[in-house]
């Protein structure tokens, strides 16, 4: 077997290189490949465990390292392939997981995977697994490994995903017990080979090592080390965090976890029986034994991590993964016990499994310690920094091992209680475990963290399940979820109505009990744990990060893949043993996009929710059982091998993707983020206990949160290029915001806890920030991007839970800030998840949002106060961060763009553009830049000393007067943009400079106009921000009054800017009108404002003609449209002295009469509404214009009023009259002679009446015509003469203006015309047709009988007499008819539509009338009836 394994491993080593080339394709392999599955499954079926022993040799070689790197991706493909072959691969995989619990089991898995890899070209992943497993198996007897292998193979064949898990698990357990001891020896002995391999691996490309291999190795190592629950679970926590990053994967993964938990429970039942004596005795026997086993197991893990460490020079991954593993160890035992009670049927097996897991944990810890020590040695050889980290990590591991051993004992003791609340306790334990891992990381001592350590053990178990599911998740996450759900049901694990919610299935009672126990345990160490966790987390994170660099270059690869958010978190989580909350915060900030993806794919299933919770520290925690179930699945054979491989491959791909994108420091930060996610998920899994555990330390967490938030804010403020800000703001900031708020907010009503946990988590994050500033700077760039969103006004800033979340921008404004919010979510998640599990165990996932626990009233009050203060602080930070982004925009325009133009000019040797034109394009930007730079400095200073002086509004009050400069910029904005476009068209050189600048990273591929628009949008942003700031201030606050004043100043500036904008629009409109007129006309004048425009029909002498009217505040423009689309200017009528009125006649209700000095006419609108609008607009304009004239000439106001009155009395000749249309008069309005073809109509120029030739023979000089002689009627001529005599001595007498042949004309007048005057009775002349005091007037059709033709006449009813006129302006009626004694009857005819009515006298038909419409007919009938009665 050994020789065979060695032979297989060398091929694996070459594959890593090939896989590295195919790193990008790795994520796609998620889809199961049947061929791959077939090849991988047979390999798994083969007894490859003996081959694992030779693998240690391969690890020593650099090729092995490469293999380890690429195998993760290969494994992903294999896993996908295995997904298709669920039956065979599942059996094999389940057996392997059991084997993982034992050393033998690990070997077969590796061998199978390696074979599959060789076939599939994914040998690298398998090699990683093999490398991890080989050291264990190398030390183990080959016989034991063979036996185990046989057992695993048998179990694989026996195991069904659901039915035969128990049988296989039993076999595996026996193997695990034997292998555990052998593994200890093997791990210890094999550590040197791994170390050498690691050292040699660093030579390989870090991407290769860090790619899929590191992920695969981590996961395999964890799976292999799973026999030691503590270490294994710790690793799983990391894995689960990584896995949980993609929501889809997380959902599948959670489901798989549940399935694995169920299968694990079944396996535990059989395994407990077999291994109760073995592993349980080992766990219970002594801490030393467990420590040894743990150390051995950890050795391989650490060693694998170490080889990758040399590849990752950046020690930023300061995640105390080892500490976390230790914490997980402690948690694992209680969690297992907790799971056991949850699974009543497999309770005994669960207990055994717990003991086995504890033993495994101890072994893992020992191995990890050994490996860390070796790694430290290697790191010392490689890098002093790595050595320092590894040494500290090793020390932490040793301490953690000791503490873990103690905690294991305590957990075993406490197991019964946890068993009752298996689901809840495991979840809560996970939460506590995270805190414990923090304590371990800090190195304060695991004794302090024993309680939380126990919880972390459960977390570790949960993580293990997640790791497996994570591995499978990449490729077969959906399958895993389904299997996990079924497995949970089989194992009788308490599951809510939604099988997908694996973490939630536990009943609320169990959860509560578990939480109480966890609270008791966690309450003791939490504070100490926090401090110790902080130190341990730093040290261990450094060490693990260094190792992870070597071992989990895959994490680096996944970080590179951070561009693919979904891939970032899921797999790189494994190596993080640091504070889970810290990881959460980091993950959210760095992997905001993945969180968003998780949020979207979020399924109704609990598994999906669990994944989301992991991703978003909030909801993932709710899946307590899912974590346990995943662990159980790992331990049990429930996980299908193909599924596991697929998940691993996907996780490795994700990890690779994420790692590849980020720097080593960033990788560390991301890993810490993953850890945070895991811890958050663990916490969510164990909300009750974990919640209580962390609750006691909520205040400390808050402190950490504050410090972290400050540190992150300070670091986050450092922005990358504006482009990065814009892009990251849009992508990363928005995604995390959505995911965090959507996932976390609904579940966590306990805002207090929500806030407290983040603070707790923030401490580790601060430490992480200190260690890995690179990641933080990237986060800060995303923060600035978020800040860049400031220009797009966003709704501020509150999270649904009432916690303040400034929006994507603020969350990302600083990694610390976003982490605080996420941490708050995580803490809130624990209580809310706990309560949510209770409330929604039988509900859909929606219940997680709808059903929330009720926070404590006292805590609520405190939360409200703190919430208000925090909101004010967050808004102030948002104002500052947005100001920083805006100043950067101004710098880009004022400095960077000018520098680009100057550089281009130097290259060409001549100016690209004139300085005068460039200054105009960038008009007023220098002043705005100086103003806002000073404003930013003061804001930053205030925020640094926020605790001392919580006020910022006074700064705006002080700078308020200078903000009016924005109005000047806004006023010239359109002109400057037009100038920019013009120069780009005319000047190719300048256009090239602009294009090149826009394509530069500094400009983020955004147009220059986009940035030039920012100052225009800034004042409205100030208004919104200050308004929100004021809303959250208490009236008693010192800054309340200043904020009101500042808001008033900003509103004034905004209004002024709006007015300026309007003026600019008015100017543009005036220019447009001027350009639309034919000829050269000066329409644009100072003070002239455009009011209204439209087309009205002008009643000319004969026909209606369209005219275009433009109304200004001082004149009415009267134009005629022409075919070219232009307008011919007829006249510009001044509003001075103009009158407008509507006619009194009913027939002309749509008409409008305008009288002015220059011209008067009747206008007809299309409707009465339009007529009224014009009438109102013109009347108001006339009134306003008259007021202005009085204002400018107050001394003449009275005189003007008198003159206007005089004009009204005697306007003759002073204004142009309205000419009566020709059609409205059929006779001379003076002599009543009828007009014919030869006897023509004439209009008097003084009064506008229609007169005949004889009546208009005189001419007279009129004022409105500048005293030019014009035809006037006799009446007007006499009146003008009288006025002339009154105003004498007048130089030009009327006689002089009379016609030249005045004497002749007098003679002609004396001669009677040949035309005979028609005698008209005086009665018919008493009333004119246009009389204004009539009861009714208008046009009607009249007929003297039914068969008579209709004739059109103008009728007037006055004094109960009906007058008939030929036209509306006739002075003499054609006839008159008294209406007394007549009756009116309406004729109801279908055709006539009630428009016809009859006039009867003594029942005899006199006339038949027809109106234009029924409405007017009804009015006429009423008028007639009124006239017929006395």
From Swiss-Prot:
Which residues lie in Basic and acidic residues bias regions? Answer: 527-538, 851-868
Can you tell which superkingdom this protein's organism belongs to?
Eukaryota
Q: Name one GO biological process term.
A: actin cytoskeleton organization
Region feature (Disordered): 1-36, 330-351, 516-538, 695-739, 800-869
Q: Where in the cell is it found?
A: Cytoplasm; Cytoplasm, Cytoskeleton
Per UniProt, the keywords (alphabetical) are: Cytoplasm, Cytoskeleton, Guanine-nucleotide releasing factor, Metal-binding, Phosphoprotein, Repeat, Zinc, Zinc-finger
Taking every annotated instance into account, which residue ranges of this chain make up the domain PH?
1089-1183, 1333-1429
Q: Which SMART domains does this entry report, sorted A to Z?
A: FYVE (SM00064), PH (SM00233), RhoGEF (SM00325)
**Extent of Polar residues compositional bias:** 334-351, 728-739
- Composition skew (Acidic residues), residue ranges: 831-847
PROSITE patterns in the cross-refs? DH_2, PH_DOMAIN, ZF_FYVE
Q: Which amino acids does the record list as binding Zn(2+) 2?
A: 1244, 1247, 1273, 1276
One GO location term (cellular component): cytoplasm
Q: Name one Pfam family in it.
A: RhoGEF
**GO molecular function terms listed in the Swiss-Prot or TrEMBL record:** guanyl-nucleotide exchange factor activity; small GTPase binding; zinc ion binding
DH domain segment(s): 871-1060
Zinc finger spans (FYVE-type)? Answer: 1222-1281
Residues holding Zn(2+) 1: 1228, 1231, 1252, 1255
Q: Which PANTHER family match?
A: FACIOGENITAL DYSPLASIA PROTEIN (PTHR12673), FYVE, RHOGEF AND PH DOMAIN-CONTAINING PROTEIN 6 (PTHR12673:SF12)
Protein name per its UniProtKB record: FYVE, RhoGEF and PH domain-containing protein 6
* Species assigned in the record: Homo sapiens (Human)
Q: Source gene?
A: FGD6
């Amino acid at each position: 077997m050994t020789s065979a394994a060695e032979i297989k491993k060398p091929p694996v080593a070459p594959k890593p290189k090939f896989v590295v080339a195919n790193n990008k394709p790795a994520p796609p392999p998620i889809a199961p490949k049947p061929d791959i599955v077939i090849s991988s499954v047979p390999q798994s079926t083969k007894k490859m465990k003996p081959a694992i022993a030779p693998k240690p040799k391969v690890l020593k070689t650099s090729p092995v390292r490469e293999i380890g790197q690429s195998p993760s991706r290969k494994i992903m493909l294999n896993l996908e392939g295995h997904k298709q072959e669920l039956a065979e691969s599942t059996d094999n995989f389940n057996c392997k997981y059991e084997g993982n619990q034992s050393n033998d089991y690990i070997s077969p898995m590796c061998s199978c995977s390696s074979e599959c890899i060789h076939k599939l070209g994914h040998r690298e992943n398998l090699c990683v697994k093999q490398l991890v497993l080989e050291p264990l198996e190398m030390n183990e007897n080959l016989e034991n490994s063979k036996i185990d292998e046989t057992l695993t193979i048998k179990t694989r064949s026996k195991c069904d995903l659901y039915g035969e898990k128990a049988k296989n698990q039993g076999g595996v357990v026996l193997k695990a017990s034997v292998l555990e001891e052998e593994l200890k020896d093997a791990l210890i002995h094999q550590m040197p080979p791994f170390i050498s391999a690691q050292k040699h691996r660093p030579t390989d490309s870090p991407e290769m090592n860090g790619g899929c291999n590191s992920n695969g190795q981590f996961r395999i190592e964890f799976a292999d080390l799973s026999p030691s629950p503590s270490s294994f679970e710790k690793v799983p926590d990391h894995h689960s965090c990584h896995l949980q990053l993609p929501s889809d994967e997380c959902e599948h993964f959670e489901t798989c976890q549940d399935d694995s938990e169920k299968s694990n429970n079944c396996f535990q039942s059989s395994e407990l029986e077999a291994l109760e004596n073995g592993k349980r005795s080992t766990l219970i026997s002594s801490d030393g034994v467990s420590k040894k086993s743990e150390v051995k197991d950890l050795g391989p893990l650490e060693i694998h991590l170490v080889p990758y460490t040399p590849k990752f020079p950046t020690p930023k991954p300061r995640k105390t993964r080892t500490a976390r593993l230790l914490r997980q160890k402690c948690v694992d035992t209680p969690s297992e016990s907790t799971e056991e009670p949850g699974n009543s049927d497999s309770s005994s097996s669960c207990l055994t499994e717990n003991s086995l897991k504890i033993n495994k944990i101890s072994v893992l810890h020992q191995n990890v310690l050994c490996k860390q020590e070796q790694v430290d040695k290697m790191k010392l050889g490689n890098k002093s920094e790595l050595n320092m980290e590894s040494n500290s990590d090793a020390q932490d591991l040793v301490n953690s091992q000791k503490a873990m051993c103690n905690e294991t004992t305590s957990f075993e003791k406490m197991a019964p209680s946890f068993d009752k609340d298996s689901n809840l306790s495991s979840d809560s334990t996970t939460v506590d475990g995270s805190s414990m891992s923090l304590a371990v990381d800090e190195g304060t001592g695991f004794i302090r963290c024993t309680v939380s350590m126990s919880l972390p053990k459960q977390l570790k178990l949960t993580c293990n399940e997640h790791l497996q599911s994570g591995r499978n998740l990449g490729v077969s996450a959906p399958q895993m979820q389904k299997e996990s759900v079924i497995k949970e049901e089989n194992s009788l694990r308490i599951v809510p109505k939604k099988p997908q919610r694996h973490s939630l299935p536990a009943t609320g009672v169990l959860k509560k009990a578990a939480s109480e126990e966890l609270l008791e345990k966690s309450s003791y160490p939490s504070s100490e744990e926090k401090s110790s966790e902080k130190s341990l987390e730093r040290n261990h994170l450094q060490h693990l990060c260094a190792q992870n660099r070597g071992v989990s270059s895959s994490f680096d690869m996944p970080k590179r893949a951070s561009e693919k958010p979904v891939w970032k978190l899921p797999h790189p989580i494994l190596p993080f043993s640091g504070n889970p909350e810290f990881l959460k915060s980091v993950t959210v900030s760095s992997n905001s996009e993945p969180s968003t993806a998780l949020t979207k794919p979020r399924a109704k299933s609990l598994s999906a929710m669990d994944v989301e919770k992991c991703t978003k520290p909030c909801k993932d925690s709710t899946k307590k059982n899912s974590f346990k179930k995943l662990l159980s699945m790992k331990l049990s054979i429930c996980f299908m091998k193909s599924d596991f491989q697929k998940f691993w491959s996907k996780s490795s791909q994700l990890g690779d993707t994420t790692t590849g994108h980020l720097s080593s420091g960033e990788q560390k930060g991301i890993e810490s983020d993953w850890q945070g996610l895991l811890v958050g998920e663990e916490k969510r899994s164990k909300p009750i206990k974990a919640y209580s555990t962390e609750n006691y330390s909520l205040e400390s967490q808050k402190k950490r949160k504050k410090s972290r938030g400050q540190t992150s804010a300070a670091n986050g403020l450092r922005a990358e290029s504006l482009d990065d800000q814009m892009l990251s703001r849009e992508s990363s900031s928005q995604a995390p915001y959505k995911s965090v708020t959507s996932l976390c907010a609904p579940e966590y009503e306990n805002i207090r806890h929500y806030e407290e946990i983040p603070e707790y988590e923030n401490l580790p994050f601060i430490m992480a920030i200190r260690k890995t500033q690179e990641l933080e700077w990237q986060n800060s760039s995303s923060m600035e991007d978020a800040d860049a969103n400031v220009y797009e006004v966003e709704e501020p800033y509150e999270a649904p839970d009432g916690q303040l979340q400034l929006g994507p921008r603020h969350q990302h404004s600083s990694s610390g800030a976003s982490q605080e919010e996420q941490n708050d979510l995580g803490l809130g998640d624990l209580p809310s998840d706990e309560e949510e599990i209770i409330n929604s165990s039988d509900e859909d996932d929606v219940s997680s949002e709808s059903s929330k626990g009720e926070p404590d009233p006292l805590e609520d009050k405190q939360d409200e106060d703190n919430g208000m203060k925090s909101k004010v602080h967050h808004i102030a930070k948002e104002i500052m961060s947005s100001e920083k982004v805006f100043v950067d925009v101004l710098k880009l325009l004022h400095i960077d763009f000018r520098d680009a133009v100057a550089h281009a000019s130097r290259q060409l040797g001549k100016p690209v553009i004139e300085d005068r034109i460039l200054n105009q394009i960038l008009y007023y930007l220098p002043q705005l830049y100086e103003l806002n730079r000073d404003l930013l400095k003061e804001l930053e200073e205030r925020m640094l000393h926020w605790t001392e002086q919580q006020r910022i509004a006074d700064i705006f009050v002080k700078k308020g007067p200078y903000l009016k400069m924005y109005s000047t910029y806004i006023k010239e904005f359109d002109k400057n943009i037009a100038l920019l476009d013009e120069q780009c068209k005319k000047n190719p050189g300048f256009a090239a400079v602009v294009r090149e600048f826009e394509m530069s990273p500094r400009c983020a591929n955004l147009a220059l106009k986009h940035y030039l628009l920012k100052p225009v949008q800034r004042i409205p942003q100030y208004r919104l921000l200050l308004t929100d700031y004021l809303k959250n201030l208490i009236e008693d606050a010192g800054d309340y009054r200043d904020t009101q004043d500042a808001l008033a100043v900003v509103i004034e500036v905004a209004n002024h800017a709006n007015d300026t904008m309007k003026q600019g629009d008015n100017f543009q409109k005036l220019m447009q009108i001027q350009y639309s007129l034919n000829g050269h006309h000066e329409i644009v004048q100072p003070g002239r404002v455009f009011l209204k425009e439209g087309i009205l029909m002008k009643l000319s002498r004969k026909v209606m003609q369209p005219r275009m009217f433009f109304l200004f505040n001082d004149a009415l423009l009267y134009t005629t449209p022409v075919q070219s689309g232009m307008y011919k200017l007829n006249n510009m009528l001044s509003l001075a002295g103009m009158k407008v009125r509507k006619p009194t006649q009913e027939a002309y209700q749509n008409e409008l009469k305008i009288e002015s000095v220059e011209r008067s006419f009747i206008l007809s609108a299309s409707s009465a509404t339009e007529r009224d609008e014009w009438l109102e607009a013109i009347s108001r304009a006339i009134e306003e214009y008259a007021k202005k004239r009085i204002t400018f000439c107050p001394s003449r106001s009275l005189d003007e009023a008198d003159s206007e009155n005089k004009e009204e009395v005697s306007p003759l000749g002073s204004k142009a009259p309205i000419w009566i249309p020709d059609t409205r008069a059929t006779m001379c309005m003076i002599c009543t002679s009828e007009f014919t073809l030869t006897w023509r109509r004439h209009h008097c120029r003084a009064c506008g009446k229609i007169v005949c030739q004889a009546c208009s023979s005189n001419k007279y000089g009129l004022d409105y015509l500048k005293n030019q002689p014009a035809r006037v009627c006799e009446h007007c001529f006499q009146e003008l003469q009288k006025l002339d005599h009154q105003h004498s001595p007048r130089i030009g007498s009327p006689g002089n203006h009379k016609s030249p042949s005045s004497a002749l004309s007098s003679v002609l007048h004396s001669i009677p015309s040949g035309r005979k005057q028609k005698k008209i009775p005086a009665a018919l002349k008493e009333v004119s047709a246009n009389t204004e005091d009539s009861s009714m007037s208008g046009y009607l059709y009249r007929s003297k009988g039914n068969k008579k033709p209709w004739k059109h006449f103008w009728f007037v009813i006055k004094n109960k007499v009906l007058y008939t006129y030929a036209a509306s302006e006739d002075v003499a009626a054609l006839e008159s008819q008294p209406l007394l004694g007549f009756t009116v009857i309406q004729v109801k005819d279908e055709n006539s539509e009630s428009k016809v009515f009859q006039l009867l006298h003594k029942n005899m038909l006199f006339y038949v009338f027809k109106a234009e419409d029924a409405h007017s007919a009804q009015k006429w009938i009423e008028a007639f009836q009124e006239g017929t009665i006395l």
